[in-house]
Amino acid sequence: MSEAEVPEKLDSADINRVLELLPHRYPMLMIDRIIEMKSDESAIGIKNVTNNEPFFQGHFPGHPVMPGVLIVEAMAQTAGALVINHLGTSGSNQLVYFMTVDRARFRKPVVPGDVLHVHVTKIQSRGSVWKYHGEGKVNGQLVAECDLGAMIAGQGTK
């Protein structure tokens, strides 16, 4: 990739930039925007949880609750976008493969109308392997947390 083709590193990302950074698309895109990115150290992503989310049809009818695994996915996507942005590449050139989830805790349900703030903080990185601590918060209250491991690789790498 030439210098002219390297996307600018930004300290936040609207939905258009998120779509450039990540290969995920509806219905699996779990981040609407990123309001803060600090190098490869930390980021805060936003997920506006609406009643129109497809997972609410079955989880649970009459009492919709965002599945915990999708809160973890939102954390992984926020961390992935942070790493891709830091490296100055795009989701079309690199993929972030989710490798591990440790110490996952779900403390409160996330429901339609909530704004999920996804905080990720780097624990360590070695080469292409990255580890982050993630926290999900609604109205400033912790709703979920975990540690995430991921590997970054070029498209087509297995």
Swiss-Prot record:
Catalytic activity: a (3R)-hydroxyacyl-[ACP] = a (2E)-enoyl-[ACP] + H2O
GO terms under biological process: fatty acid biosynthetic process; lipid A biosynthetic process
Record: active site: 59
InterPro entries in alphabetical order: FabA_FabZ, FabZ, HotDog_dom_sf
Coiled coil: none
Entry's Gene Ontology cellular component terms: cytoplasm; membrane
GO MF annotations, alphabetized: (3R)-hydroxyacyl-[acyl-carrier-protein] dehydratase activity
Cleavable signal peptide: none
Keywords tagged on the record: Cytoplasm, Lipid A biosynthesis, Lipid biosynthesis, Lipid metabolism, Lyase
Subcellular location: Cytoplasm
EC number: 4.2.1.59
One Pfam family this sequence matches: FabA
Role of this protein: Involved in unsaturated fatty acids biosynthesis. Catalyzes the dehydration of short chain beta-hydroxyacyl-ACPs and long chain saturated and unsaturated beta-hydroxyacyl-ACPs.
Family from the record: Belongs to the thioester dehydratase family. FabZ subfamily.
NCBIfam families per the UniProt record, alphabetical: fabZ, PRK00006.1
Protein name: 3-hydroxyacyl-[acyl-carrier-protein] dehydratase FabZ
Source organism of the structure: Parvibaculum lavamentivorans (strain DS-1 / DSM 13023 / NCIMB 13966)
Lineage of origin: Bacteria, Pseudomonadati, Pseudomonadota, Alphaproteobacteria, Hyphomicrobiales
